[in-house]
Amino acid sequence: MIISIAAIVVTLSILVTFYTSSPRSEFLPEPKGSSLEFIATRLEVPWSIDVDSKGRIFFTERVGRVNMIDASGKVLNLFSKDVAKVGEAGMLGLALDPEFESNGYIYIYYTYSSNEGLFNRVSRVKIDNGLIREDILIDRIPAAEIHNGGRIKFGPDGRLYVATGDANNPMLAQDLSSLAGKILRLNKDGSIPDDNPFPNSYVYSYGHRNVQGLAWNPINKMLYATEHGPIANDELNIIKPGANYGWPYERCSEAKVYEQSLLCYAVSIAPSGATFATDGKYKGILFFATLRGEHVEMVTLDVSDPTKVVKMENFLSGLGRVRDVLYHDGYLYIATSNRDGRGIPSIEDDRIVRVRLG
């Protein structure tokens, strides 16, 4: 059941953290000028959020649904797919075409089951007069019950970036012939860009365990990615074309043989969706969701040197597991993940909430 409810103002938290995360807590004092609204409740593991120029909110639910919340707050199911509902698999990433208002294209990443096992794919979907047309762009991405990646985002260059997991087979991350454990880059029609770092390959970077968040700094257009580590060693990385991020040979590039992480967390927080504020007083600040950490992390970078972190703060606590965050037009949109089998859901979970950044 999906319901939309009226805005409820609750509190936020601003609390400094250092490579650790606090346990689930009650809401803390609200920063001046900020408020939080419940946009939709009783969802089934919302996984990815996007917002169009009209303010309509699009999101996936892992059970196989793609939904929209219109400007009046009404939740509509646009379409559903028969996805593999095992472990962390299912309907995962979603991205609207940069020209969505004119072409209506929605890009999705989901897991399916075949006679040969589990696979992930990236498709482009258009709804036209009630008919759903799906064009498969990339297929047979290795999948498993865990480590499916799944985040898809359009970069400032107009290319679609796809985060894949190692499909619980760590060595695939180092295999350039495999699509697993990578960040992929493709044109909107599914073709390979001529300027990709490896000839005739979707691979943009490799050596990844399970990337869950992608975000571009609006100041310098650099790509940042969040990644789950083993036990601990969760990472925030700056992604460079053709770079090797070391998995499974290194954790957080301990020996500095591979590309070094910007942040390495000694305690597991399970970082997920990421976003930069693109305007206002928060411009250039990175926000990312944490599942095990159960908060939204806020990272302030050095303006003159974006490879240096100035400050990390716990921006929002009290919602439980957080799967995705998205900044749009002065608001931070947040999806919880308390019904994913690892949380403690309340009757109103899962939720999509919206925070106005004051």
What are these regions (language model features)?
Residues F38-G64, A270-T275:
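Beta-strand-rich domains and repeat architectures in extracellular enzymes and scaffolds
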Residues W47-D50, A95, K153, A215, ...:
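Conserved beta-strand position repeated across blades of beta-propeller domains
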Residues R56, R65, Y105, R159-Y161, ...:
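Generic structural signal for coil-to-beta-strand starts
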Residues F38-E44, F79-V86, L137-A144, Y202-G207, ...:
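Surface loop/turn motifs at the tips and blade-to-blade linkers of beta-strand repeat domains
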Residues F119-K153:
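Asp-box/WD-like beta-propeller blade repeats and closely related beta-sheet repeat scaffolds
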